[in-house]
């Protein structure tokens, strides 16, 4: 068993729009010039329906963005949320200690301090579920049938590919509140974003299918939970 910290986040469900026009445009591999730019992201459920969602975390990958501000919309009004300033990292995780309930997020990228062309490989808005040292047994799934489709559970379809990540994760000493939050998210969506850490740094960010049939035990003396999850990279 490998013992290393994991971060568990809700899955990123949103639709990207610019100029206040909702669309299903991808917000991966963005190249933004002619700054300043204002981007709007409408939060959805896993089926694409617009909803209010509780979020507290911004994750940026493969980016050269230096500074930006974010606002969240509630009841038709935008309020200040997160600020990025002086960033020099290509992967950024910003967490608000207090979750906000929002239906949309507005990202403003100013001209000042940013490069002429801002790139964002991937952007997502999440709910931070928990992080702790989880006992894990991780391996890379080798699929000899690359290009085929494979049904995992119900309407979940996995596109066969080489080197997909899969893991059995055992989380020990989990307080009841975190156990309930994490297990309910798995039951509701069967998807999580999982960030394994190696040497206290990002090793990768995985969007995963989770088997909704979870296993758990509770220590009656400590009232702490042990939760077992099976994850496969989408």
Please give the residue ranges for each predicted region:
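Beta-strand signatures of extracellular beta-sandwich domains
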Residues: 69-71
